[in-house]
């Protein structure tokens, strides 16, 4: 695990840029960070207690707050602010983005939910 050399919210507030000293750079969408928040309201209090997040397509990053020397608190415009993203967790999210994003899309599809806040998914037979 390494500490990023740069963490910036892009101007549109829908993405977090993370850079490391080895030259690696990652752009993590706000929606992705929100649905994979380490906060208890998302992760629950143990394995199998997760709450599937949906309707977060338009979520933005309102602000960042450093949590000691080991983590970042991300505040989202939907009011969510309880997730403390350790540098290690952010690196895991970045390195496994494709796999985690595909899994999330499959989970909301299987649950009949939408990434859009006001959408209602109707299954046709």
Please give the residue ranges for each predicted region.
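Motif-centric detector for short Cys/His coordination patterns
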Residues: 1-125
């Amino acid at each position: 695990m390494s500490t990023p050399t740069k963490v910036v919210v892009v101007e549109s507030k829908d993405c977090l840029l993370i850079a490391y000293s080895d030259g690696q750079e990652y752009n993590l969408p706000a929606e992705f960070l929100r649905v994979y928040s380490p906060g208890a309201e998302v992760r629950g209090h143990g394995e199998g207690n997760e709450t599937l997040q949906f309707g977060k397509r338009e979520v933005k990053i309102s602000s960042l707050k450093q949590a000691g020397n080991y983590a970042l608190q991300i505040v989202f415009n939907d009011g969510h602010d309880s997730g403390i993203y350790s540098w290690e967790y952010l690196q895991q999210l970045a390195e496994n983005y494709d796999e985690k994003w595909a899994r999330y899309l499959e989970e909301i599809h299987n649950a009949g939910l939408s990434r859009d806040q006001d959408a209602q998914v109707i299954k046709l037979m």
